[in-house]
Amino acid sequence: MKKSAFFGSVALAALVAGAASASTLDDVKARGQLICGSNPGLTGFAAPDANGVYQGFDVAVCKAVAAAVLGDPMKVKYVPLTGETRFTALASGEVDVLVRNSTWTFSRDTELALDFVAVNYYDGQGFMVNKSLGVSSAKELDGATICVQTGTTTEMNLADFFKANNMTYTPVNIADDAEGQQKFAAGACDSYTTDASGLASSRATLPNAADIVILPEIISKEPLGPVVRHGDNNWGDIVRWSFYALVAAEEYGITKANLEEVAASTQNPEIRRLLGLEGDMGKKIGLDNDFAKRAILASGNYGEVFEANIGASTSIGLARGLNAQWTQGGLMYAPPFR
């Protein structure tokens, strides 16, 4: 490990120790607002709309947590963060939770003293090129210029992939997705590399989307999910189970529209615990027993959130793939509410 990396990790750990000395739950309640670290602008995942209101797949997680804790999904302040600033912002207490398409890795989990509490999107890194480049495989990119975001796993995966395939490239460093889209569109790089979901989002926003192809290779595993500070385990539990309430709701056929009807009629013990009709799940994490119910009502279940923001009917057009429910061949399921 390089000394700079070591001292950087130590500094982050020190920030976390200070920030976690007080309860995040107490801070959020006292403030009356959840502060959520977010992407500066990734269409479908987290981006302000024409009215400046943040919308997207990751935004829905922030709304679910705010609804669970504060009773109102709109009581969220979104702080746009780059790949380089996001973890420091969380560690220092600038944000309460980070939901910014961030990959769960060994070093981030251990050295940075941060906790990834769930995976809300299973992804992998890919490459995007203009059809005019005349390549159909990432293994044909030898000597190419590649737009890549600094401070990310993308940067490291890119180096590994080219080294493993005995190829060379010239990186064109970018700070965020918006800059990557701009430089790629301007021809500053031959290819843009990031998570495949991010590529689909970027392509959808470009005027010449029909002329852009996402190459078939997926060169990494990118489990993306919400992150909290290490040491405040109760807050981690709140974020984790607020998210899993959305996943469980989809499994049991509970939607934003039918939740009240299901709650009034169900005899399924798991659903009754999930919706706070039996047991004391909420009390175990410092909330009331309707916390999961409010989380679901914020934006709907996991499937509703996926389809509304990034699904097949949207301009992003992502298939569920690995993010389908376990009953549908995917990896997505919630631990038992018991």
Curated annotation (Swiss-Prot):
Family: Belongs to the bacterial solute-binding protein 3 family.
NCBIfam families registered for this protein in UniProt: 3A0103s03R
Primary role: Part of a binding-protein-dependent transport system for glutamate, glutamine, aspartate and asparagine.
Places the protein is found: Periplasm
Protein name: Glutamate/glutamine/aspartate/asparagine-binding protein BztA
Stored Pfam families: SBP_bac_3 (PF00497)
Keyword terms: Amino-acid transport, Periplasm, Signal, Transport
Record's GO cellular component terms: outer membrane-bounded periplasmic space
Signal among keywords: yes
GO BP term, example: amino acid transport
Gene that produces this protein: bztA
Top-level taxonomy: Bacteria, Pseudomonadati, Pseudomonadota, Alphaproteobacteria, Rhodobacterales
Family annotation (SMART domains): PBPb
Signal peptide from the UniProt entry: 1-22
